[in-house]
């Protein structure tokens, strides 16, 4: 339904005059509504929706968003606002999904939350899908969300890189790479999307296949394979915020690189829960969920093969 608002008559604002020119109407379009495919919170005025049905709808919508974001990757430099809005919607949906999956977030904060990314949200964005090429890096660059940030008026964009060492010498049997990547590389993807930094795992052990790593060692572009396992964090941002974003990413990574006893590792439990959800094997309160609801099983999305 269209809405009409009456604007006052003459400059004096006075009434008077019986003519029809005493006022004018401006027609407004109806407020934007969320598309039918965009699921809301499981709590509606009509009652509580079934948890499994809600999760399936959420994951289906999320897979559509992820597929569209993947298609937008080549256009990030020319469509920054669109990409920023897309990231915000992905965050909204993953927040709802995470709230539905876990009721104990406050008791077990994730490293992402402690890093200050989601200070006003209970979610750590479990549910993102990603595609990552060689050396365990995430493929798509994060969409800039700093366009309207205060203090970015200088227009000077700088590129900076920091290195974060992985303590494999102290904990040789700890699976740091798996903890960093998460299911389908989602955990690393969330760090990238939330900090506007690119995160790459480099060094010995950064290629999944040891035989392939031995083959690539010494070749151009793979010199890092002679170094200990480490992380490179790259940021190309306005000079006013680039250091803050790099430090934000470093703080999150430091948390992820702190070994936790498996029985108390809530973050790993959430990763396993996410993997079960993506594989379609998650069971909520005894309610069966048939079929896979992985984002890769819809819209023709395929997992990217790695060179390593």
From Swiss-Prot:
InterPro entries for this protein: BBP-like, KH_1_KHDC4/BBP-like, KH_dom, KH_dom_type_1_sf, STAR_dimer
Start and end residues of each stretch annotated as Disordered: 1-26, 284-308
SUPFAM superfamilies xrefs: Eukaryotic type KH-domain (KH-domain type I)
Pfam families xref list: KH-I_KHDC4-BBP, STAR_dimer
Start-end of Gly residues biased regions: 7-24
GO CC annotation terms, alphabetical: nucleus
Location, primary (coarse class): nucleus
Subcellular locations according to the entry: Nucleus
Alphabetized UniProt keyword annotations: Nucleus, Phosphoprotein, RNA-binding
Modified residues (Phosphoserine): 294
Record-annotated KH domain positions: 165-232
Any GO molecular function: RNA binding
Keyword Ligase: no
Matches recorded under PANTHER family: OS02G0722700 PROTEIN, RNA-BINDING PROTEIN RELATED
Protein name according to UniProt: KH domain-containing protein At4g26480
């Amino acid at each position: 339904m269209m809405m009409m608002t009456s604007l006052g008559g003459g400059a004096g604002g006075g009434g008077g005059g019986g003519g029809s020119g005493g006022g004018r109407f401006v027609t407004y379009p109806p407020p934007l509504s969320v598309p039918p495919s965009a699921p809301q919170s499981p709590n509606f005025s009509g009652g509580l929706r079934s948890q499994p049905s809600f999760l399936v709808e959420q994951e289906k919508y999320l897979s559509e968003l992820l597929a569209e974001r993947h298609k937008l990757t080549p256009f990030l430099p020319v469509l920054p606002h669109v990409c920023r809005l897309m990231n915000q919607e992905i965050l909204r949906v993953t927040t709802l999904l995470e709230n539905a999956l876990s009721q104990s977030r406050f008791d077990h904060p994730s490293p992402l939350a402690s890093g200050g990314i989601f200070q006003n949200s209970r979610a750590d964005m479990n549910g993102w899908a990603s595609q990552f090429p060689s050396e365990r890096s995430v493929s798509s660059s994060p969409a800039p969300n700093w366009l309207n940030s205060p203090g970015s008026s200088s227009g000077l964009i700088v590129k900076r890189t920091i290195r974060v060492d992985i303590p494999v010498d102290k904990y040789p049997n700890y699976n740091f790479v798996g903890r960093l990547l998460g299911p389908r590389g989602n955990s690393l993807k969330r760090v990238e999307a939330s900090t506007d930094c690119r995160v790459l795992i480099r060094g010995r052990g950064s290629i999944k296949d040891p035989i392939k790593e031995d083959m690539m060692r010494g070749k151009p572009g793979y010199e890092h394979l002679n170094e200990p396992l480490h992380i490179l964090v790259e940021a190309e941002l306005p000079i006013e915020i680039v250091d803050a974003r790099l430090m934000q990413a470093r703080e999150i990574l430091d948390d992820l690189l702190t070994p936790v006893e498996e029985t108390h590792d809530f973050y790993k439990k959430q990763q396993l829960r996410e993997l079960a959800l993506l594989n379609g094997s998650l069971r909520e309160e005894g309610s069966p969920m048939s079929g896979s609801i992985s984002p890769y099983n819809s819209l023709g999305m395929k997992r990217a093969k790695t060179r390593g």
